[in-house]
Curated annotation (Swiss-Prot):
GO terms for biological process: positive regulation of canonical Wnt signaling pathway; protein autoubiquitination; protein K48-linked ubiquitination; ubiquitin-dependent protein catabolic process; Wnt signaling pathway. Pathway: Protein modification; protein ubiquitination. Keywords: Cytoplasm, Metal-binding, Nucleus, Transferase, Ubl conjugation pathway, Wnt signaling pathway, Zinc, Zinc-finger. It comes from Xenopus laevis. Residues 296-308 have a biased composition (Polar residues). Signal peptide: none annotated. It is found in: Cytoplasm, Cytosol; Nucleus. Pfam families: WWE (PF02825), zf-C3HC4 (PF00097). It catalyses: S-ubiquitinyl-[E2 ubiquitin-conjugating enzyme]-L-cysteine + [acceptor protein]-L-lysine = [E2 ubiquitin-conjugating enzyme]-L-cysteine + N(6)-ubiquitinyl-[acceptor protein]-L-lysine. This is E3 ubiquitin-protein ligase rnf146. It is an enzyme of class 2 (transferase). Residues 281-314 are annotated as: Disordered. GO terms for cellular component: cytoplasm; cytosol; nucleus. Disulfide bonds: none annotated.
Length: 314
């Protein structure tokens, strides 16, 4: 880089009254609005990156689509910078939303209308007043065509996606200017982001799901985890009663069933019951009440009257 007083290609850029051998002055007046190194024009809604380089907001937006890096130093741009940019003059955004004239130009958004930036609005208004059918606009590094007859815009090399445009008064409700939200919309946007970032939305979803009835676990898992001792005992009692029922119905080995018939052609169990009754009659009444009755009741329970085998030969 050539220093002061050295001949270089930038010598022609010096003022005519400035000599090459004069020392450089550091008190040169600085521009109130910086120039953008991307579009090479005066910055429109200038923003400052973390690396302190300044560009147009739309120029940074277009460059971030190609790669999230500064166009000068290649430092990485934060992911949320486009949502929360650092504006050099936020007051300019408010004045731009109020407009300089009676009418302004808008393009259609997802849930409302966006106002064009001041430079693009001047180009559209100039083409409209001159009666042109279309005009070209450079927005965020892409060349767009504004069809003033059908009031739509599209990229010059991509006609598939079209967006409506309109010329309307300045005071209509709008989302913002050139992708920059106004304060009311930005507050709602930040609130929505905070709700999704701190887990409030997910917690609310969990709260809604907790009000729904819980899924029933399988029967076997429920029994193994929450069965009490009394339930286990009742289960064993049921099993015992089933076995007794099978015994009463004489479901078992057929060889055992054949042994129920005695030698005299009477059922063997009945003969034993008669012998037991004879013994009980010889005992004292107290003994009969203490011992005989339970035995008799037990035998009667084992072989009901309805299940006795008929008399006959085996």
């Amino acid at each position: 880089m050539a220093g002061c007083g050295e001949v270089s290609h930038s010598a022609n850029m010096l003022p005519t009254n400035k000599k090459l051998d004069e020392p450089c002055s550091n008190n040169a007046p600085s521009l109130s609005v910086p120039e953008c190194a991307i579009c090479l024009q005066i910055c429109v809604h200038p923003v400052s990156l973390p690396c302190k380089h300044i560009f147009c907001y739309l120029c940074v937006k277009g460059a971030s689509w190609l790669g999230r890096r500064c166009a000068l130093c290649r430092q990485e741009i934060p992911e949320d910078f486009l949502d929360k940019p650092t504006l050099l003059s936020p007051e300019d955004l408010k004045s731009a939303s109020r407009g300089n004239g009676e009418y302004a130009w808008y393009y259609e958004g997802r849930n409302g209308w966006w106002q064009y930036d001041e430079r693009t609005s001047r180009e559209l208004e100039d083409a409209f007043t001159k009666g042109k059918k279309s005009t070209e606009m450079l927005i965020a590094g892409f060349l767009y065509v504004a069809d003033l007859e059908n009031m739509v815009q599209y990229r010059r090399n991509e006609h598939g996606r079209r967006r409506k445009i309109k010329r309307d008064i300045v005071d209509i409700p709008k989302k913002g200017v050139a992708g920059l939200r106004l304060e009311c919309d930005a507050a709602n946007l930040n609130l929505a982001r905070e709700s999704s970032a701190d887990g409030a939305d997910s917690m609310a979803a969990l709260g809604d799901s907790s009000s729904q009835p819980a899924h029933v676990l399988p029967a076997r898992l429920h029994t193994s985890l929450s069965t009490t001792t009394s339930q286990v005992l009742s289960h064993s009692d049921v099993t015992t009663s089933l076995e007794n029922s099978f015994t009463q119905l004489q479901i078992g080995d057929p060889v055992i069933n054949r042994n129920y018939i005695g030698e005299e052609g009477r059922p063997l169990i009945i003969a034993r019951m008669q012998a037991t009754n004879a013994v009980l009659e010889e005992q004292e009444p107290s003994d009969r009440n203490d011992h005989g009755s339970p035995a008799l009741q037990h035998n009667s329970f084992l072989v009901p009257q309805s299940n006795r085998l008929p008399f006959g030969n085996p």
